[in-house]
């Protein structure tokens, strides 16, 4: 699937999987592990370079492609739809939960994580 077709699916609110998202990113971008933070003030989660790489790639991809917060969350597939929405009081997938609360305002990268191939 092409990058343009994938982005059109996301923008049309069609269901995509985490695996599809990571595959599209890997096919179209070079990844550089980087530290990123997600959240604000006492709810800020700092992710060291090389940790939570799926989240790092997805947030960087969504930012580059100017996706809305809801479109960005859809990129996490079942981690968002089942694990987080299905367990609203849970503590798993904290990067997703923080993004739901703080959106793009809470996302900060130490450096650029993705570069187009």
What label would you give each PLM region?
Residues 43-92:
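Amphipathic protein-protein interaction modules
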Residues 11-35, 111:
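Short, charge-rich, low-complexity alpha-helical interaction segments
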Residues 6, 38-47:
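A ubiquitous short alpha-helical element
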Residues 2-10, 113-116:
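Long, charge-rich, low-complexity intrinsically disordered regions
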Residues 3-7, 30, 55-58, 62:
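Intrinsically disordered, charged low-complexity linkers and terminal tails
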Residues 91-117:
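Long, compositionally biased
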Residues 24, 28, 75-79, 99:
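Short acidic/histidine-centered micro-motifs embedded in hydrophobic/aromatic stretches
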């Amino acid at each position: 699937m092409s990058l343009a077709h994938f982005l059109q699916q996301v923008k049309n609110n069609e269901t995509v999987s985490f695996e599809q998202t990571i595959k599209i990113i890997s096919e179209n971008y070079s990844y550089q592990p980087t530290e990123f933070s997600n959240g604000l003030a006492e709810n800020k989660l700092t992710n060291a370079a090389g940790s939570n790489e799926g989240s790092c790639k997805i947030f960087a991809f969504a930012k580059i492609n100017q996706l809305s917060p809801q479109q960005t969350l859809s990129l996490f597939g079942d981690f968002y739809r089942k694990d987080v929405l299905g367990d609203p009081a849970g503590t798993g997938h904290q990067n997703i939960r923080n993004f739901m609360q703080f959106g793009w305002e809470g996302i900060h990268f130490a450096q650029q994580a993705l570069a187009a191939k």
